[in-house]
Amino acid sequence: TEGGAVHTMCQYTSPQPSPNCGTYSNAHITAADKETILKVHNDERQKVKAGQETRGNPGPQPAASNMPDLTWDNELAAIAQRWVNQCKIGHDGCRNVERYQVGQNIAMSGSTAKGPCNMNNLVQMWINEVNALNAADVSSMPSDGNYFMKIGHYTQLVWGKTTKVGCGIIQFLDGKFYKCYLACNYGPAGNMFGAPIYQ
């Protein structure tokens, strides 16, 4: 437990999708999904590192001297998959591992047609939050709640001290829409208020 929150793997002991999900499919990350998720994350991180991210409010974003590529972590992915398998939209209460605190990004898309979830589009939703980020704030993560809601997925994705990512996906029928629900867990966690987003 952390601050009274029960860890996702302890709270939800079944590896199967919850009855909350109703009709579901695609309840696992494929090798191709993993490759896409890593590529989209690392393409943006390399772009930032090179000083080529021109977007922002205002931009351009500063270049980074320390921006390692993320690598996949199966433990983080297993916790993310267990969480999306609950079909509860939002962040889980505790997802930390012994190694470090763990951050999380979530995204959702919907379609009337059933088909594979588009990992590129889901991750791009987080990257597009750069449009709201004031480049001057990279040196110290702002704590303003309303502002954080607009930039927090992006800032975790490019957090300089984060090195690992692991994700889970599920597609479930919600009324007439097939919803794709993606969660990615990041270690060590980013979005520490007052700390540099990257250096």
Curated annotation (Swiss-Prot):
Signal peptide: none annotated. GO terms for cellular component: extracellular region. Residues 47-67 are annotated as: Disordered. SMART domains: SCP. Gene3D superfamilies: CAP. It holds the Pfam family CAP. Keywords: Allergen, Disulfide bond, Secreted. CDD domains: CAP_euk (cd05380). Disulfide bonds join 21-87, 167-184. This is Venom allergen 5. The lineage of its organism: Eukaryota, Metazoa, Ecdysozoa, Arthropoda, Hexapoda.
